[in-house]
Amino acid sequence: MNNYFLRKENFFILFCFVFVSIFFVSNVTIIKCNNVENKIDNVGKKIENVGKKIGDMENKNDNVENKNDNVGNKNDNVKNASSDLYKYKLYGDIDEYAYYFLDIDIGKPSQRISLILDTGSSSLSFPCNGCKDCGIHMEKPYNLNYSKTSSILYCNKSNCPYGLKCVGNKCEYLQSYCEGSQIYGFYFSDIVTLPSYNNKNKISFEKLMGCHMHEESLFLHQQATGVLGFSLTKPNGVPTFVDLLFKHTPSLKPIYSICVSEHGGELIIGGYEPDYFLSNQKEKQKMDKSDNNSSNKGNVSIKLKNNDKNDDEENNSKDVIVSNNVEDIVWQAITRKYYYYIKIYGLDLYGTNIMDKKELDMLVDSGSTFTHIPENIYNQINYYLDILCIHDMTNIYEINKRLKLTNESLNKPLVYFEDFKTALKNIIQNENLCIKIVDGVQCWKSLENLPNLYITLSNNYKMIWKPSSYLYKKESFWCKGLEKQVNNKPILGLTFFKNKQVIFDLQQNQIAFIESKCPSNLTSSRPRTFNEYREKENIFLKVSYINLYCLWLLLALTILLSLILYVRKMFYMDYFPLSDQNKSPIQEST
């Protein structure tokens, strides 16, 4: 009975010991984790303070530079054209990012923000500190308290400017998009600075911007932090970025251009870059001997030939004359006041116009990933591309079926049917494999033998649209970058911008498209900044704190289990002696 009582008592003590040990070890773990987190936060604050000091030093240096520049400008009466341009690197692509973005500085001291370049909208906005419904982006939410020049646009019931609504004593920012998503928050003003990589002068001005307090859909998951709209100001509307930019820099021509490649590109403020024009680069290398005996100052016409070996050449044997003279840019009138709409009058495939309308208003929009066209035009293009899409080169039946096609058997006869058949034969011969991904989008292994499209603009000018542009690189394939229009809104998106210099002349209200070799900028080459978003890393192991806590708990349980086994062994030795020890002295004597 006594032995039983002793065992029960000791097991009760053991239970209490185990409970206290677990509680102690767990609290120690939490305290250590919190200490680590606090240390990392302190380091982050120190880095931010250093960033502020650097920003103040930059401001002082900028003032000195501006004074020196003013003195230099007074002495220099002649400027080079290149010095009048401000160039900004664009990052991103069509496949991974679905947009192109640039970095600008907001506030004093500055905080860098990555912004999607969007010619289809007018707002400049990004998430701010305190937003609970915002996604995780490249930079931390903008902190208004860090900037000496930030000012929230407060209101009292109905005294907001520009017809804005007053919500919660702040003027409401609200933006809706065609795919159904919304972002909203409040307006604030601050200094916007554009650091150019080719010009030491910085464009800087005050701008009313939107602070995101709620994000939805695509904005919630995008990597870039915000959006930079480049469209024009509506009557009585909030002044847009592009209008304020040229208003505060009257020395600049009200022209800007966008030049994007497969990866990255460039935004040019104040004009365009003729050195990027493809025709200029071809002239510098070597001109066709038969067509280019005259000097480069004359009109230059390039005959586009068969596309059997090079995707930069035409898809059929018929020569198509396209003017590529640098000094003879073909401009297209902007047909609407506040957005960049132009008229197109035809869309040719193998010499056949597949447009059933005389003209079509299309929005030139760098914020749209793909080019959106009317359903009937899309179906026509898709029909011919489907014939050229062969996913099984060993299927003799399907191949013979395509080879037996006649011009009369097609949905719409082609003017250059023989070139279409030649391209089909070459695709089969070269085994240019084609697969289909989501929504039946065709993807080819190579650009060879795929057709060029031609868009008819004003004055019957036909602009070439190459496969390297309307297709985009997806891993090792080239996929179609065309979609059916939504809400009856045709759009010339990034798959139209690619490999062209798109020039916006705001003074003359016109746009031009010039084939160009646009610069590439990989996102991996993008400079880092103190305010970029970083997941907190454990200083011991690069694992989450939950995993660290579990590791500590497992270690504690292992130690406790060892103690239990040791104590259990001691109990058995004390209260359950060996059989030889259980014999009494009397029994031994007998």
From Swiss-Prot:
One of its GO terms (biological process) is proteolysis. Residues 33-81 form a coiled coil. Changing F370A: Loss of catalytic activity. This is Plasmepsin V. It comes from Plasmodium falciparum (isolate 3D7). Disulfide bonds join C128-C211, C131-C134, C155-C166, C160-C171, C259-C518, C389-C434, C443-C479. Residues 282-291 have a biased composition (Basic and acidic residues). Residues 100-514 form the Peptidase A1 domain. Component of a complex composed of SPC25 and PMV; the interaction is mediated via the transmembrane domains. The complex interacts with the SEC61 channel-forming translocon complex and is involved in the recognition and import of PEXEL motif-containing proteins into the ER for subsequent export. PANTHER family: ASPARTYL PROTEASES, PEPTIDASE A1 DOMAIN-CONTAINING PROTEIN. The transmembrane domain is essential for localization to the endoplasmic reticulum. It is not clear if the zymogen has a cleavable propeptide. In vitro, appears to be cleaved between Asn-80 and Ala-81. Cleavage of the putative propeptide is dispensable for catalytic activity. Optimum pH is between 5.5 and 7. The active site is at D118, D365. The gene is PMV. Residues 566-590 are cytoplasmic. GO terms for cellular component: endoplasmic reticulum; endoplasmic reticulum membrane; lysosome. It holds the Pfam family Asp. It comes from the Eukaryota. It is an enzyme of class 3 (hydrolase). Residues 282-316 are annotated as: Disordered. It is found in: Endoplasmic reticulum membrane. InterPro entries: Aspartic_peptidase_A1 (IPR001461), Aspartic_peptidase_AS (IPR001969), PEPTIDASE_A1 (IPR033121), Peptidase_aspartic_dom_sf (IPR021109), Plasmepsin_5 (IPR033866), TAXi_N (IPR032861). During the asexual blood stage, plays an essential role in the export of several proteins into the host erythrocytes by cleaving the pentameric localization motif RxLxE/Q/D (termed Plasmodium export element (PEXEL)) located downstream of the N-terminal secretory signal sequence. Specifically, cleaves after the leucine residue in the RxLxE/Q/D (or RxLxxE) motif of exported proteins including RESA, EMP2, EMP3, KAHRP, RIF/Rifin and STEVOR. Also, by regulating protein export, plays an essential role in gametocyte development and thus, parasite transmission to the mosquito vector. GO terms for molecular function: aspartic-type endopeptidase activity. Residues 292-304 have a biased composition (Low complexity). Keywords: Aspartyl protease, Coiled coil, Disulfide bond, Endoplasmic reticulum, Hydrolase, Membrane, Protease, Signal, Transmembrane, Transmembrane helix. Belongs to the peptidase A1 family.
